[in-house]
Amino acid sequence: TFPGSNCDRDMDVALKKFGFKNKMVWHDDQELPKSDLIVLPGGFSYGDYLRCGSMASKSKIMKSVLNFAKGGGKVMGVCNGFQILVEAGLLPGVLLRNKYLRFICKNIFVKVNNKDNSFFKNTKKDTFEFHIAHNEGNFYCSKEQLKEIDENNQVALFYSDKSGNINDQNNPNGSINNIAGIFNKEKNVL
């Protein structure tokens, strides 16, 4: 949990609903407890006064998160957590202001692109409805990075309609190629 996180309790409740035993870890801690999964929640870490997630990516706890991920541990970032993982260098690309420069708060659909990983291998559905609330969720990367992401099958989720059709009309923030979520090359960071 970082100063300004406001979805940490929501994430705690959601994970408990699925049978996870959770422990909240503060940004100033230096060590992670023994874990199967590290989740970086949404919110506005450090008020998002600089680039979203940039200050949190330099927090003391992030050294342990980086080491955990590099050792093969599973890490997931949601909303501001995604921004933090990008800023920390665990995921490629950047997250920019939304295409129409407005805060977006609504339900959207995403289509799972890659089930060859521990996050989605047991999912029966291909399309999920999620709630989003962000000002800087526009995923962008260079052409070279995009080519590498495609070659390594790193796109986890695409924005889609309820039936799983991927198109620009269902892309709420202008993300390149309608990308809603990505993996690292090893597919242990989402």
Predicted feature descriptions by range:
Residues T1-V78, I84-P92, L96-I104, K111, ...:
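N-terminal beta1-alpha1 cap of cysteine-dependent amidohydrolase-like domains
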Residues V13-A14, F120-L190:
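C-terminal and late-domain segments of enzyme folds
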Residues W26, N114, D161:
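Residues at the C-termini of beta-strands that transition into short coil/loop
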Residues C79-N80, H134:
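Conserved acidic catalytic centers in enzymes
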Residues G81-F82, D116:
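Short, flexible active-site-adjacent loop segments at beta-strand->alpha-helix junctions, enriched
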Residues F82-Q83, G137:
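Short hydrophobic/aromatic residue motifs in ordered secondary structure
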Residues L96-F128, I132-A133:
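Alpha/beta-hydrolase-fold enzymes
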